[in-house]
Amino acid sequence: MRLYALLPCFIFAAACAETTHYEWAVPVKAEANLYRVDDKLYRSEQPVRDDAALIKKLGIKTVINLRYFDRRGDEKALAGSGIALFNQPLLTWRIRPKDIAATLYLIERQQQYGAVLVHCYHGADRTGLMVAMYRIVYQHWPVAEAKREMLQGPYGYHSIWVNLERLFSAEDIAQIRERLSQLRGDKNKLSPPYSRGREIF
């Protein structure tokens, strides 16, 4: 009898374990593909001048541009905002674990000054990859859940980039963590592949 009495508890616990909910980024401005990942990280497509007031209102202190081509969009959109602007150029078809680690470390460093916005052109692929890795490394999401948000979230991921999906292997994630540890060990030196942020007033 005692076993039957406990059975509903086991079933309930198992159901809860299977339905653990990992909350995707919260929409802020849909037409800018702007979402809040957490208190210190936002994601979007390439900002335009009309986005500047909102970005500042959100308390964003740093904007990191992942675009490889046409890198001056942030200067045009955010001139006079006082926001620190960084270029961290990535070619979508040639992103390596060390590039991911470098970008995550830049986000980590800049978050000590306030919220960070990371973007590429569409805010879907390179940005989606970085947010997924941020989920794994800093928020301790299961790899499958972080990858699912990147692929299935409302951000417009382009399935052509199968190489990005392959970066979720255990080996690549271990390399990312190892490289991050190395970068933290040399935290007082800002060296390539970083570019120093420009504050534009």
Regions inferred by a protein language model and the residue ranges of each:
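Bacterial N-terminal signal peptides
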Residues: Y4-A13
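Cys-dependent protein tyrosine phosphatase-like superfamily
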Residues: C16-V116, L129-F201
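Short cysteine clusters
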Residues: C120
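Conserved lysine of the Walker
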Residues: R126
